């Protein structure tokens, strides 16, 4: 085998050698997001924003209620993200920033692996991205997966959305007004499980609209990561 270290687990092994590449934990934070009432047609959409520095940050989120994390803006190496609260209740969230690993050691003891040009590719003192699962789903009802013994967070890789046009309950026979609703796949984590469900982000029960009833939708894509003891 190539020079390096093989780590065996129940799923096989990981080869740590000069070609090893992973993202490491760079930063973390937490917050409480006020309630949103968009599903009921209200005007309150609540989120928190935070800014991190990096090269290619990936944000993993733990959320006690349905939430979605997305990039708001980038200016050079500064990235601003938002976490949207998809429920009409306070939402406690944690976030973890993973990014490209650098050449700095993280301690005075442990195992370090360097490549042929002297770059540090693994340090046992660092916390690296640990992917448990990749989840791609078409928009639909609530789905839940369990990961026993793990504390899980989720990285939203691609939006899952649905835009619904239906006859208005205010006047079902009107050709000029419709019920409109936009929906977004949001995620909730509970210790060792992850749930994903479509959550309404905007509703108008009597909106000026001259089209037919219709549904436009796209799938969502997620990485489930293990943040146990992080």
PLM regions: where:
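Low-complexity "stalk/linker" and mucin-like segments enriched in Ser/Thr/Pro/Ala/Gly
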Residues: 66-76
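Extracellular receptor-binding modules and their adjoining Ser/Thr/Gly/Asp/Asn-rich linkers
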Residues: 1-47, 85-174, 199-230
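A generic structural motif
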Residues: 78-84, 194-198
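Long, low-complexity, charged/polar intrinsically disordered accessory regions
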Residues: 175, 180-193, 198-201
């Amino acid at each position: 085998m190539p020079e390096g270290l093989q780590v065996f687990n129940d799923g096989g092994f990981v080869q740590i050698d000069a070609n090893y590449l992973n993202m490491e934990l760079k930063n973390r934070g937490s917050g409480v997001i006020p309630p949103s009432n968009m599903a009921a047609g209200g005007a309150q959409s609540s989120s928190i924003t935070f800014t991190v520095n990096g090269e290619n940050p990936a944000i993993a989120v733990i959320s006690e209620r349905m939430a979605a994390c997305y990039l708001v803006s980038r200016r050079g190496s500064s990235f601003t993200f938002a976490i949207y609260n998809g429920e009409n209740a306070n939402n406690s969230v944690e976030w973890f920033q993973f990014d490209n690993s650098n050449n700095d050691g993280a301690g005075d003891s442990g195992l370090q692996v360097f490549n042929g040009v002297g770059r540090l590719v693994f340090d046992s003192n660092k916390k690296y991205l640990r992917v448990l699962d990749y989840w791609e789903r078409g928009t639909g009802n609530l789905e839940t997966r369990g990961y026993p013994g793990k504390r899980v967070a989720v990285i939203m890789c691609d939006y899952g959305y649905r835009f619904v046009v239906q006859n208005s309950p205010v006047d079902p026979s009107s050709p000029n007004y419709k019920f409109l609703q936009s929906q977004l796949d949001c995620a909730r984590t509970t210790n060792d499980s992850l749930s994903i469900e479509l959550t309404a982000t905007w509703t108008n029960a009597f909106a000026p609209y001259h089209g037919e009833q219709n549904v436009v939708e796209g799938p969502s894509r997620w990485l489930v990561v293990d943040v146990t003891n992080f």
